[in-house]
Design a protein with these regions (language model features):
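Conserved class I S-adenosyl-L-methionine
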Residues: 1-25
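Class I SAM-dependent methyltransferase SAM/SAH-binding core
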Residues: 40-84
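A conserved beta-strand element that flanks and buttresses the S-adenosyl-L-methionine
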Residues: 97
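A short, conserved alpha-helix within the catalytic core of class I
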Residues: 105-116
Length: 200
């Protein structure tokens, strides 16, 4: 449908934005694709040379990712895992990418997730959140009237200023600073990217 087309275009623009914030050459780097879905970003990271841990709560999406990419040369660099991004104990990463996954947590849980991930990350975290705006609130309300197949999973919008204040006040993120930000808004897809960079 037309709705799905605008969502697909928006997601593609957001995916390209987040990927552009990571180094072109990721050889020897460990990257977490948090909430990897069907692994579209994971395979792009692997093509850049990264060793990727790709985690998602959905077993069916992980199975689909394994089926889709098992014949590709880069597949051996990706470890697809069914599980919670907050419970990867003992792993260390150079970068974390979380596209449209933290947006499903309420604000406090989203912040706690970033704090938990930050403990195991050496360089940067790039992620998206649903910005609390009047147009998004209106779309959210209107969206409830669409057929279930056209509806997006539940999201938890947060005002950018509130998120920035929460990040600034977090005792767990004192070594991190906010880098780039970018909002994508195409029809029924609205999401905002943010970069957190660990200070040297």
């Amino acid at each position: 449908s037309g709705i799905r087309e605008t969502v697909r275009a928006g997601r593609e623009e957001m995916r390209n934005t987040l990927l552009s914030w990571l180094p072109e050459d990721l050889s020897g780097r460990q990257v977490l694709d948090a909430g990897c879905g069907t692994g579209v970003i994971s395979i792009e990271l692997a093509k850049r040379g990264a060793e990727v841990i790709a985690v998602d709560l959905s077993q069916s999406l992980i199975e689909l990712a394994n089926e889709r990419y098992s014949t590709m040369d880069e597949y051996h660099r990706i470890q697809f895992i069914v599980g919670d991004m907050r419970q990867l104990e003992g792993e260390r990463f150079d970068h974390v990418l979380a596209m449209d996954s933290i947006i499903h947590y309420v604000a406090q849980d989203g912040l706690r997730t970033l704090e938990t991930l930050a403990d195991s990350v050496d360089e940067s975290m790039v992620f998206t959140f649903a910005p609390k705006t009047l147009p998004l609130a209106a779309m959210h309300a209107v969206g409830k009237f669409f057929p279930r197949s056209d509806r997006a999973p539940a999201i938890e919008p947060i005002a950018p200023a509130v998120l920035l204040r929460s990040l600034d006040q977090s005792s767990e993120l004192t070594d991190w600073t906010v880098g780039r930000e970018h909002r994508v808004s195409t029809g029924f897809y609205t999401s905002q990217a943010m970069e957190l960079v660990r200070e040297c």
